[in-house]
Amino acid sequence: MKINLYYWNNGVGVVNHSKLIKTLLYEYDVISYDISIKNEYRKSDLGIFIQNILPDELSNNKKNIYIVCEEWLTDFEMSHIDWFDYIFVHSNHAKNLLSLYHKNVINTGFFSLDRYFFPTNTKELLHLKGKSIQKNTELVWNYKKDTNILDSSHKYLSENELIHELNRHDIHICCSLYESWGHYLWEAMSCGKLVICSEIPVFKEYLNPELVKFVPIKNIYDFVINYEFLNTKNYKFRKGYFVDNFKFNELLNNKENLFEFQKRNSDNIRQHFLDVNKTNKQKFLETIKFIL
């Protein structure tokens, strides 16, 4: 069976997602196409589009799947959503949103890279912004004396450097305004590290509240002019989940308790990552087999 995998090389999560999917589908004849450059596309049994679409290429494939992160769906993409046979999403929250627009929306979950590599305990905190505009870095700047902030817009991290930072820091702050999943959070957990995260829908679905530190949501906004992620009306499903600053401050004022929690629960945190990753990989594979 031939599968064409289409993705836009954004230099971050989408690229990793495409690699993960191609590796998982090793039993099939898979070709990956970076649609940010010109390509000659073959005909296939199944086309899988990750976030970005090429409407003119759908006819090359007998069936087509669209994998979406709902917060990045544009009006253009929404206008073509019914051209696809199936829509894959990462959570029941997203399924409920998009089932109003398509009859075959399937929650396949998500899976991330296992970054475990001889983790150490340094009693340090990290906020890995990467290139993202939705990690709520504005919140963490107020605590930069206590937290290392890595911004890929200013300093590029190699793959080895990224793995080193994930394994070196005991606590990772990921109070995202919104995520349809969240590679950073899961990759940190793969190293047995404690994550402080916002109580947004997808995190609540998949995370064990006994193994992470949730920060309650105080307000939800569609538009906030001072936040790049929310300073637009171009994305129908985009919302910003703002955490309770007081509760966040309370957590950071008890860092020693957090470090002890991480050390005590490290193995269980990693096992939770492994369990969810395995379950969602199986679900994805079984769904592909059903469709083909």
Name these PLM-found stretches:
Residues 177:
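Aromatic "clamp/platform" in nucleotide-sugar-dependent glycosyltransferases that forms part
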Residues 194-197, 204:
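Short hydrophobic beta-strand element within catalytic cores of glycosyltransferases
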Residues 232-290:
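A charged, aromatic-enriched C-terminal amphipathic alpha-helix characteristic of glycosyltransferases
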